[in-house]
Amino acid sequence: MDDVIKKGLSIVSELRDHGFEAYIVGGAVRDYHIGRKPKDVDVVTSASPEEIRTLYPHAFQINRQFQTLTVHLQKVAIEVSTLRGGSIEDDLCSRDFTINAMALAMNGDIIDPTGGKTDLENGVIRSFHPEARFKEDPLRMLRAPRFASELGFTVAKGTAEAIKGSCSLLADVAVERVEKELTQLMIGTHRSSGWCLLHETGLYPFIPGVSLSKETVLRMKEISRSPGLLPADGFWAILYLLENCSMKLPLAKEKKKRIRTIVHYVGERQNHSWNETMLYQASLSVATVVEQIRALFGQASVHEEELRQLWSSLPIQTRTELAVTGRDVMAHFQKKGGPWLADTLADIEEAVLLKHIENEKKSIIQWLEERRVES
């Protein structure tokens, strides 16, 4: 049995020892059935949030609406929620899809009121009373193509029809909740199926924070047929590049910066080949993604091994590898810091990178002295 499941069951056991019902539910049970390692584990219990906190004083509440607390057990974060409805069956019937609506009891029994195990075996994404489920939380509609991409399953006809009839509700979902689902869709093994489903259900115009045209969705569907696996930021960069697609998602600052960098160097590669300076400024990881994007668009691309060889030949790969620091430069010139220092360090960096001087403190100081004499 997987270690994550074991840790979840230890929480279940402890809750039961204190007189509460408790079960492992959701994606962990699904993954357990298909032989996939669960990324995390959720537990539901008849205990109230206050009672959960009494048992686990260090637990913190992350979702007041669903009365969910996170309990850390040996570096594994376990979400513990109070049962919705009067029973475990009521709780499971209110979940997004049948494949996520199974519970694992302490004795190993599977509670499956909606036929999730059968749907799992048949590779079907189906919602129990889909109109009601999507009205409760419209984001669930976006999770259908996400799971189609991740698992390679097909969506049941009734569920797909319910998405078509309810898709406008998605526009009211907070944009902060959209990023995770779209990211998982983009990096799934069967991502082309996810984009296909966005198109077929008519869901794509209603995704908050992303203005997707039909042409963009169909282009992403075709691009995603490639067997090569592009990292998520590469797919986000492609969305930025494609016409008629604008982004208003509140992505993390560093993620936005990296995506913009990838987009910039995709543009640079239209007119320039990689050289030492350009590769150094971009970084090997960005350059690799840029070449993967070029390949997806049918453009001539540089093989990753060639990029690695050029990268390995660089005298330095980051400024922190310089043999001198800003403190060394200030001490040598006996001057306080200021704009001159940043300019001087940039000059040193360029000279070392272009192999005009050795990356050795004595050589750099001598070079600085020669420049001072010349000026």
From Swiss-Prot:
Entry keyword annotation includes Protease: no
Q: Which GO terms describe its molecular function?
A: CC tRNA cytidylyltransferase activity; metal ion binding; nucleotide binding; tRNA binding
- Which GO biological process categories is it annotated with? tRNA processing
**Reaction(s) catalyzed by this protein?**
a tRNA precursor + 2 CTP = a tRNA with a 3' CC end + 2 diphosphate
Residues bound to CTP: 27-30, 95-96, 100, 137-146, 177
> What residues does Mg(2+) bind to?
40, 42
**UniProt xrefs under Pfam families:** PolyA_pol, PolyA_pol_RNAbd, tRNA_NucTran2_2
* Record note on pH: Optimum pH is 9.5.
**Top-rank taxon, per record:** Bacteria
Database matches in SUPFAM superfamilies: Nucleotidyltransferase, Poly A polymerase C-terminal region-like
Q: What is its EC number?
A: 2.7.7.-
Transmembrane ranges, per UniProt, are none
Q: Which cofactor does it need?
A: Mg(2+)
Which keywords accompany this UniProt record? Magnesium, Metal-binding, Nucleotide-binding, Nucleotidyltransferase, RNA-binding, Transferase, tRNA processing, tRNA-binding
User: What PANTHER family does the record point to?
Assistant: CCA TRNA NUCLEOTIDYLTRANSFERASE 1, MITOCHONDRIAL (PTHR46173:SF1)
Please report which protein family the annotation says this sequence is part of: Belongs to the tRNA nucleotidyltransferase/poly(A) polymerase family.
Function according to Swiss-Prot or TrEMBL: tRNA nucleotidyltransferase involved in the synthesis of the tRNA CCA terminus. Adds the two cytidine residues to tRNA.
Q: What is this protein called?
A: CC-adding tRNA nucleotidyltransferase
Q: Provide the taxonomic classification.
A: Bacteria, Bacillati, Bacillota, Bacilli, Bacillales
